[in-house]
A protein has these predicted regions:
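N-terminal Rossmann NAD(P)H-binding glycine-rich loop of SDR-like oxidoreductase domains
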Residues: 4-24
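Flexible, glycine-rich beta-alpha linker
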Residues: 124-126, 182-199
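Conserved Rossmann-fold NAD(P)-dependent oxidoreductase catalytic core, especially the SDR/UDP-sugar
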Residues: 78, 100-161
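NAD(P)H-binding glycine-rich loop region in Rossmannoid oxidoreductase-like domains
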Residues: 51-97, 101, 124-127
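N-terminal Rossmann-fold cofactor-binding loop
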Residues: 31-36, 53
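Substrate-positioning beta->alpha
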Residues: 164, 169, 194-199, 213-235, ...
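Mid/C-terminal beta-alpha module of Rossmann-like enzyme folds, strongest
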Residues: 234-300
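Active-site Tyr-X1-5-Lys
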Residues: 144, 148, 157-182
Length: 315
């Protein structure tokens, strides 16, 4: 029976990764913190392990003790990470340094027999395709064709602290000699247990559709179970050291997305409210300032502002 280590196991994606690992017959080890919830991790076949990805000495001791009793891992899926943080340094500590520390320690202790799959993000690309496309007559293209699609050929230019921390993690992994790894860059992930898209659905349920900007926004998504399937395929497939974008292959207009939510939930009417980008910028600035003062992260912050104002899509 192959042995797999899954980080971020108590999170949205991580809990589904654990379920899939058990379904496929893996000897499954779920990484948790002392404060982590086990709400979706109740299967008695799950083995739990506490790892401190923020401390070299502690992590080395924890993995060494594990190895003495249970041996090495055959595979690792690293899905842990911070999507919200008070500042860029905090993002780097978790997403960049934590990722590098885990992979490096596994290599140093010879505790990884197979592949390391890193769950990164589309956010590493940034706003690389934000200039409107002009048609032969000089006019700007309309609708979802207004901006060109993001492709593998684009050089990443992340415009958020989160995106920069994930890209730096990708680059850090590439410096580790002997590491067999693949990076997955999913677009927006939706499904049961997810909270951010739930907030949008809840807003529609309350008859309000709030949008930012007056030009069309192209949205791309991937269902959580499809992302999970891709993670397990990547254990065996994919070019070593390569990054792969993941989506369901469709492009959605932001209005069409809200209309779909309205239809599926049976909401009879919705007030569609559009706010200028400058207004969202002001709200996110204030929200970020309050978060710094209180120490509590808000869904609306300057990183989220960059994400919400972006118009582009995957090819």
């Amino acid at each position: 029976m192959s042995k797999i280590l899954i980080t971020g196991a108590s999170g949205f994606v991580g809990s589904f990764l654990v379920e899939k690992a058990l379904e496929l017959g893996f000897d499954t080890w779920a990484v948790l913190r002392k404060t982590s919830s086990k709400e979706y991790l109740t299967d008695p076949r799950i083995h739990f392990i506490e790892l401190d990805l923020g401390n070299d000495a502690v992590l080395t001791q924890q993995l060494s003790e594990h190895a003495a009793q249970h041996g090495a891992f055959d595979y690792v899926i690293h899905a842990a990470g911070a999507t919200k943080a008070p500042n860029e340094a905090a993002f780097r500590r978790t997403n960049t340094e934590g990722t590098l520390r885990l992979a490096r320690t596994l290599l140093d202790l010879q505790l990884l027999n197979g592949r390391f799959v890193f769950v990164s993000s589309l956010s590493v690309v940034g706003a690389v395709a934000e200039n409107p496309i002009r048609q032969a007559d000089g006019t700007v293209a309309q609708g979802l064709d207004r901006y060109r699609a993001i492709t593998d050929a684009d050089t990443p230019q992340p415009n958020t602290a989160y995106g920069r921390s994930k890209l730096d993690a990708e680059r850090a992994l590439a410096t580790l000699e002997g590491l067999d790894f693949v990076t997955l860059r999913p677009t927006g992930v939706y499904g049961p247990r997810e909270r951010d898209y739930f907030l949008m659905a809840d807003s529609i349920k309350k008859h309000i559709d709030f949008a930012v900007g007056y030009t069309p926004q192209a949205l791309t998504f991937i269902y959580v179970r499809d992302l999970v399937d891709a993670c397990f395929l990547a254990l065996q497939r994919g070019e070593r050291g390569r990054s792969y974008f993941l989506s369901d292959g469709e492009v959605y207009d932001s209005r069409a997305f809200s209309d779909l939510l309205q239809q599926e939930m049976g909401v009879k009417w919705v007030a569609h409210i559009k706010a200028p980008v400058w207004f969202l910028h002001a709200v996110c600035q204030v929200s970020t300032w309050i978060s710094k003062c209180t120490g509590k992260m808000s869904t609306l912050n300057m990183d989220k502002f960059q994400h919400m104002r972006q118009r582009t899509r995957l090819s």
